[in-house]
Amino acid sequence: MKTAALAPLFFLPSALATTVYLAGDSTMAKNGGGSGTNGWGEYLASYLSATVVNDAVAGRSARSYTREGRFENIADVVTAGDYVIVEFGHNDGGSLSTDNGRTDCSGTGAEVCYSVYDGVNETILTFPAYLENAAKLFTAKGAKVILSSQTPNNPWETGTFVNSPTRFVEYAELAAEVAGVEYVDHWSYVDSIYETLGNATVNSYFPIDHTHTSPAGAEVVAEAFLKAVVCTGTSLKSVLTTTSFEGTCL
């Protein structure tokens, strides 16, 4: 009597069943700002025992990402134990007097502004409010949320190192505190490694302007994010495949 051979069973480690979703702008997105640049989100998967879904979109702010339903789209598919990393700031400034659809309402709390954009009346929230609302969407699904400060523009652009954080760095930290989620000071960790690398190297990372990085630069920016994760003990550390990254803890 022949017995059927049992196929071997393979089980994925629990970390591999975890998904990390990214929400951001061109500095995080695939193909960055175009012309051969790339966003740092494209390099995270190399260091994680988790699936990475890069939902960053060029040209977006916290406001426009919200208006287009992109946070909702992530919330529709995220499951308990997944991560969502949110990083905006580059496109959130400007004036509402000539509304470009991206500028947030000025302030740090529940302030609201009103505008007509693309023929539609819009109630505009502050930058922290958009991030807090997004965080609540994801935590309600059991996801682990990390609010990250934006990356710096080229601090060596003038030939002299200049560290000048935008207000959105502080706002991201405030939003994380109010929402009760984790915060990564990506700005400071990128700035620190840029200062160490020096003028010539860092300038080579910005082939088209002072904002968008080359693939090599984007990988440095990704590693700086993970250095911050390791140094601050952020929960994402549990799915890292290495904890050895250049730079010092701040």
From Swiss-Prot:
Residues 1-17 form the signal peptide. Disulfide bonds join C105-C113, C231-C249. GO terms for molecular function: hydrolase activity, acting on ester bonds. Pfam families: Lipase_GDSL. Glycans are attached at N121, N199. Belongs to the 'GDSL' lipolytic enzyme family. This is Rhamnogalacturonan acetylesterase. The gene is rha1.
